[in-house]
Amino acid sequence: MNILGIYGAIGWDGNIPYIVERMGNFWVHGSGATLIMNGKLKNAINEERFSRIKYDGTYPKLSIQHILDYNKLTNSDIDLVVYVCSSTEINFALKQSTYIEKKLQEYFPNCKVEFLAHHLAHSAATFYTSGFKEANILSFDGAGDYEHPSEDSGKWLTPHFKFSIGQDTLSQDNKICEVHTEFCGNAPMHNSFGNLYDICSLKTYNIKTKNVKDDHYVEQSEQHSYPGKIMGLAAFGDYQKVNLPEWFSLEKWENEFPQLQSNNADYSIMFARFNPDDLAAWMQHQFEKYLLLFLSNIPKKLKRDNLCLGGGCALNILANSKIIEQGI
């Protein structure tokens, strides 16, 4: 059986000005394709490797064609296409209208189409490549897919992280069981680890580079480079020199997990008073502080010996090292 995994915009270019203007950073980025043949992973490629466009989010036609050619396959040889939908409103609408499913079946005439949730894709990627038989899994980033309407507002909710348990058993069912979800509601989603780091990185980067004439990272699509650069800048600052409201407050315990609520501070105004190096250090400290708080309070009945991290926030190697140091 040939299974093709796809992530990327279908039916639009992934970066329509209307979407950028209305939704800010909610554009499709990092598209790519993966092939599994008879249960074995054969290829996994990002579109930007071929297009040479950083964070390319368009339909990954070059990646797909390379995979097909490499394995001597045609579009008709694909039995199943698994599509990971994004959290943009337009992709959500296209999925709901069955446009995406019909388009994929047009591209791959003999395939069935299934949709895979954003955070489940992250969770599977980290767990199934870990070698662990059993593990806690935390997938966390700015936001995931739209999931279901809020009882209060009727608006569709997006999770900014999911906590799961992975178990590699002989059974094919329930290998990854989601046990806790934190929803960030709708934009601007300030109670999201990833979104807060992203917003604060943008403010800090702009302060740091305001007098730099040749700034190579000014385009909308390049702003996803900011968090990594600010993480590196943190080593040069002192978080204790920054007196700002905490990112989160611990409002209550829900399902025996700490529930973190954003303080909704307007950091865009407050940041201007501080050195950007110190701001970077403060941001990193806040990220580590509340991530470690959450991971340290996993209920005992759910706690496993191993931990897998997935999603954009899992790229924060400084926080990852703290997790290892504290034996979480």
Residue ranges of predicted features:
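Short acidic/glycine-rich loops and adjacent helix/strand connectors
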Residues: 1-328
